[in-house]
């Protein structure tokens, strides 16, 4: 099961007592800030959680799986996420029953 933006908004509604529309707008605004920063080429650092980084990948050779034909895979920029140590520790503890 996955945590959705709707569930995050519902949690804000239940814990903070704000109305559902405002909670949904807060969640959307949070993710829009992250998107905007990444689109501008900025790294996003969320203390205690992790970092969203941009990596430039060079062009490389590839193969069409249907035809076997060699084709170039174009250069591109990708988003990567590196979890912080606190997040790693909490996830590990939750999965080992500590």
UniProtKB/Swiss-Prot annotation:
GO terms for biological process: DNA recombination; positive regulation of metabolic process; regulation of DNA-templated transcription; regulation of translation. SMART domains: BHL. InterPro entries: Hist_DNA-bd, Histone-like_DNA-bd_CS, IHF-like_DNA-bd_dom_sf, IHF_alpha. The keyword DNA-binding applies. Keywords: DNA recombination, DNA-binding, Transcription, Transcription regulation, Translation regulation. Heterodimer of an alpha and a beta chain. This protein is one of the two subunits of integration host factor, a specific DNA-binding protein that functions in genetic recombination as well as in transcriptional and translational control. This is Integration host factor subunit alpha. The lineage of its organism: Bacteria, Pseudomonadati, Pseudomonadota, Gammaproteobacteria, Alteromonadales.
């Amino acid at each position: 099961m996955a945590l959705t933006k709707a569930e995050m908004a519902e949690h804000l509604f239940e814990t903070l007592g704000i109305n559902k529309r405002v909670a949904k707008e807060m969640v959307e605004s949070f993710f829009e800030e992250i998107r905007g920063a990444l689109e501008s080429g900025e790294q996003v650092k969320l203390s205690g959680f992790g970092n969203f980084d941009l990596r430039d990948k060079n062009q490389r050779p590839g193969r069409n799986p249907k035809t076997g034909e060699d084709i170039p895979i174009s250069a591109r920029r990708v988003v990567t996420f590196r979890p912080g140590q606190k997040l790693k520790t909490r996830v590990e503890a939750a999965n080992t029953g500590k």
